[in-house]
């Protein structure tokens, strides 16, 4: 997938295709996703209404930039607090073979199932809280705008297989969140610039363990 820098405002489907090098079929599936998002959003407030006119950058590109950070051979991804499906459902459409979307809100879970059905995305929706949901051991766990790292890590650890990674897009609080999380967790941290948020960072975390526990 291309690493082309994202253009300025008025980012549309054709810009997304140029930036990420996706096929016409993938673009059509994302367009169907956009149509469903616009249809359902007034009733269940999936995303801020102000972001709908910039959905290709604010939501699709923001999610798609994580694809290149997945380990080679990633098969199972668990997305926590999926909401409107970002980033998990976009990553499923882009080609992750098995994605599990954890979303406790029943209405949002219904939306996710409908998008997965219409687009043919390989996604399973779990209408449960992350503390109770069950999924296969994951090669990667993702979450966007769900919680502080200190709260995310114990949730993610439930699903990660040994050697798995976490991908968390974060805003300007990333450094502070890492400092707090390291009080209770050890981890290897890789930080990448966000292509959609100049003040944000993409965190790729591996070798995650509660502080004091040996990684086996």
From Swiss-Prot:
Q: Which residues form the signal peptide?
A: none
Which positions does UniProt annotate for S-adenosyl-L-methionine binding? 81, 86, 130-131, 144
SUPFAM superfamilies attached to this UniProt entry: S-adenosyl-L-methionine-dependent methyltransferases
The record, for Pfam families, names:
GidB
The record, for InterPro entries, names: rRNA_ssu_MeTfrase_G, SAM-dependent_MTases_sf
The name on file for this protein is Ribosomal RNA small subunit methyltransferase G
Under CDD domains, the record lists: AdoMet_MTases
Q: List the disulfide bonds.
A: none
Give the location in the cell: Cytoplasm
Q: Which UniProt keywords apply?
A: Cytoplasm, Methyltransferase, rRNA processing, S-adenosyl-L-methionine, Transferase
Record-linked NCBIfam families: rsmG_gidB
Q: Mind naming one GO cellular-component term on file for this protein?
A: cytosol
Top-tier EC class: transferase
Report the catalytic activity. guanosine(527) in 16S rRNA + S-adenosyl-L-methionine = N(7)-methylguanosine(527) in 16S rRNA + S-adenosyl-L-homocysteine
At the top level, the lineage of the source is Bacteria
- GO terms assigned for molecular function: rRNA (guanine-N7-)-methyltransferase activity
Similarity comment: Belongs to the methyltransferase superfamily. RNA methyltransferase RsmG family.
Cytoplasm in keyword set: yes
EC numbers on record? 2.1.1.170
